């Protein structure tokens, strides 16, 4: 059991290894837009230098703006027992299908689930845009769960022999067909349960902020006890704080922080 959990934790490092380079690109781009380092003339929005740096910065944000999709597609590389490339394709299609189901159910029965899908997908709304789909903001947690489900289906069904007249659906197509049916209840359960999970995460964040030394102890204990399993990412990811803000806020305000003389 422990070896399987460790294998899962190790599989998470495949997408994680994309972060260092992307972070360096974004950090350098923000630095090169700081007039304190390169001068006022080069940071003028109309200058060719500033425009090139902006273009490079936007490319650097690719990984951070698409983390759920990257985690979903990256996990089968370490978890699929065979044909890892085909498993990644099946996961990508199924992950997008799951998000489309969430969008359709939310738009149709949003009042039943207590989710307002007519609002814009902005911070605090509980919604996000994923590959052009307005869906629940399940972050990498939803991506990991869906990726795990579809990868398990791939491991079980990829080699299954079908009748000759259905041979065209054998392999990856068969996995995607079964996953399509599985994504319907998954989307339903996500709409039922995830809003409550979001409230729980917010409550835990509030506790860690306000509990002083006890909050620090709880956070550190949970992180350290999960390190042997490789699942400590679930703890420090959502809850690392910078002056009562998610650490992700630093990436959004990095430019203004660099320009500050304080």
Language-model features, listed with the residues they occupy:
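Interfacial/capping segments of alpha-helical transmembrane domains
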Residues: 21-50, 92-120, 192-220, 224-225, ...
